[in-house]
Regions:
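Conserved motor-coupling elements within RecA-like helicase/translocase cores
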Residues: 118-133
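Conserved helix-turn-beta segment of the N-terminal RecA-like "Helicase ATP-binding" lobe
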Residues: 92-114, 209-217
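Conserved Walker A/P-loop ATP-binding site and its immediately adjacent core
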Residues: 64-65, 82-102, 140, 199-203
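Helicase-associated low-complexity/disordered flanking segments
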Residues: 1-45, 50-54, 148, 271
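SF2 helicase catalytic motif II
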Residues: 136-140, 147-189
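Conserved SF1/SF2 helicase motif Ia
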Residues: 72-95, 185-191
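Walker A/P-loop NTP-binding motif
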Residues: 44-51, 64-79, 179-184
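Conserved interdomain linker/interface between the two RecA-like ATPase lobes of SF2 helicase motors
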Residues: 193-272
Length: 272
């Protein structure tokens, strides 16, 4: 849809202040005044509904801020609830922790906890946390015994980053987590919202069906799958194929053409 950019003021609208919070408005002060195209498209569903969402968009297109919109909605609508942010790698977990230390802990006064193989907080820290950033394996282990861990039943939002890795080694763990959280929601009669973040997907409809996402046309649809062309920084792709069954001879065959391709397409820019 060709929508005008949503202003930052939408997080604390003067005419309907109950729809937001003043601290939400201050969260992005000095960073931007308008949300980008991807965030604008998904804003209403993320911030003004409790629908499950699948957001597929290229790297660097603002998916993290989109996830933050869902987190802000959870803080507003479910005070005392917990937000779980699941990232596939410890490095990504650490990146989120460093980014949110000031943004969410200082500005919003939320308690943030890291849960990975390197960091295992005690029970008191987990019970007092508003946001738990973790790897799939750690949350799988924690949530298995959910009946004995009351804080698991307080989860109101689960954000799964890089959910397209469902088809990789960690796929079965993500499947178990989603199924278990939906089961917990049914048993406790407390809604648990699931937001999946991904690159652009070829089978977005299948993944949306599995997540229980509404796909109807209109502003409340929970499926957003953007083309690579929506990147803020355009990306050109040039693909050359080389036959070869064995790795070393194939690499040797590709050496000179790779150098020639760099000289042709990126003669004055860094190359890796």
């Amino acid at each position: 849809l060709d929508l005008p950019p949503v202003p930052r003021q939408a997080l604390f609208p003067p005419d309907n202040p109950e729809l937001g919070r003043e601290e939400f408005f201050k969260l992005y002060e000095g960073k931007f005044e308008f949300f980008n195209k991807v965030q604008t498209q998904a804003f209403d569903t993320l911030f003004h509904s409790e629908s499950n969402v699948l957001l597929g968009a290229p790297t660097g297109s603002g998916k993290t801020i989109s996830a933050e919109l869902a987190m802000l909605a959870a803080f507003r609508d479910h005070p005392g609830g917990k937000v779980i942010y699941i990232a596939p790698l410890k490095a990504l977990v650490r990146e989120r922790i460093e980014d949110w230390k000031h943004k969410l802990c200082v500005v919003l006064n939320k308690k943030l906890v890291e849960l990975t193989g390197d960091y295992t907080p005690d029970m008191r820290a987990l019970q007092g946390a508003d946001i738990i950033v973790c790897t799939p394996e750690k949350w799988d282990g924690i949530s298995r015994n959910w009946q004995a861990r009351s804080y698991v039943t307080k989860v109101s939002l689960v954000v799964i980053d890089e959910i397209h890795l469902l088809g990789a080694d960690r796929g079965p763990i993500l499947e178990v987590i989603v199924s278990r959280m939906r089961f917990i929601s049914t048993r406790t009669e407390r809604p648990v919202r699931i937001v999946g973040l991904s690159t652009a997907l070829a089978n977005a409809n299948d993944l949306a069906d599995w997540l229980g996402i509404e796909k109807q046309e209109g502003p409340k649809s929970g499926l957003f799958n953007f083309k690579p062309s929506v990147r803020p920084v355009p990306l050109e792709c040039h693909i050359q194929g080389y036959p070869g069954k064995f790795y070393c001879p194939r690499m040797a065959t590709m050496n000179k053409p790779t150098y020639a391709a760099i000289r042709t397409h990126s003669p004055e820019k860094p190359a890796l």
